[in-house]
């Protein structure tokens, strides 16, 4: 103790009229039997705004947003016709309490029971390796990611599989889907030589490794294609 007294004043503002939007894209499945089943990729589009200076959010989560859009564009423009439906979503309001992802599960565009897997991408834009957080019971879903990495991407890969049955931190979008019984694999990067400032003005594009983002697009695209084609997704 320094035996000192301090007075602290906080000035805050609440804007209940604020509106955010989820952004959704879909490639409809072509197989009469499998098309109702859905493979998803998602991540949050928002950052923390002005606090009071601009917070760029290049890694968190500009990186994940770009990867999802890249995978969606690659598959949509390739002429590929998936058997299962592929759904891509950018959530609003993750930083203010998972608002966008919670809205989606409360007002789903597809039946929640039809979603066979969600790949949640957050802060995958630095370092050299790709990490996957996965609950133990979703080892079969994780195997598609590992196969895509081993065959096409060939990045150092690690997973939390076997550590526990908690899919991810409860303050990330994947947790909202996990609580509904949907298999979730949360993808991120590891191995950065320089720590990227978290929720800080220093989270800028100059720190981003575009090579690993390119490989992440390839990983997500390939995994979704593979899962779309199998006769049955084993969970």
Describe the residue ranges of each PLM region:
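Soluble metallo-hydrolase cores and metallopeptidase-like ectodomains found primarily
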Residues: 1-57, 73, 77-83
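Second-shell loop/turn segments in exported
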Residues: 10-14, 52-61, 90, 128-138, ...
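Short acidic/His/Gly/Ser-rich catalytic and metal-binding motifs that mark active-site loops
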Residues: 34, 47-52, 127-129, 193-198
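Active-site alpha-helical elements of protease catalytic centers
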Residues: 58-71
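His/Asp/Glu-rich mid-to-C-terminal helical/loop segments that flank catalytic regions of hydrolases
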Residues: 73, 189, 194-235
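C-terminal soluble interaction/assembly domains
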Residues: 74-81, 112, 160, 178, ...
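Metal-dependent peptidase/peptidase-like ectodomains
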Residues: 91-195, 232
């Amino acid at each position: 103790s320094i035996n000192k007294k301090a007075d602290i004043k906080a000035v805050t503002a609440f804007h209940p009229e604020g509106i955010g939007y989820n952004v959704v894209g879909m490639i409809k499945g072509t197989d009469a039997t499998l098309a109702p089943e859905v493979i998803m990729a998602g991540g949050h589009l928002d950052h923390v705004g002005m606090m009071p200076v601009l917070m760029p959010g290049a890694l968190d989560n500009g990186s994940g947003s770009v990867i999802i859009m890249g995978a969606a564009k690659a598959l949509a423009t390739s002429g590929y016709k998936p058997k299962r439906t592929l759904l891509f979503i950018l959530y609003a309001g993750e930083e203010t309490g998972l608002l966008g992802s919670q809205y989606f599960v409360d007002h789903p565009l597809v039946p929640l029971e039809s979603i066979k897997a969600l790949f949640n991408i957050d802060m995958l834009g630095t370092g050299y390796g790709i990490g996957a957080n996965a609950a133990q019971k979703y080892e079969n879903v994780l195997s598609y990611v590992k196969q895509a990495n081993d065959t096409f991407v060939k990045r150092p890969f690690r997973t939390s599989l076997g550590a526990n049955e908690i899919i991810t931190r409860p303050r990330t979008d994947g947790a909202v889907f996990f609580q509904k019984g949907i298999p979730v694999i949360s993808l991120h990067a590891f191995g950065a030589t320089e720590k990227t400032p978290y929720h800080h003005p220093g989270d800028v594009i100059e720190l981003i490794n575009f090579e690993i983002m390119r490989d992440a697009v390839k990983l997500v695209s390939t995994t979704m294609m593979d899962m779309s084609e199998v006769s049955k997704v084993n969970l």
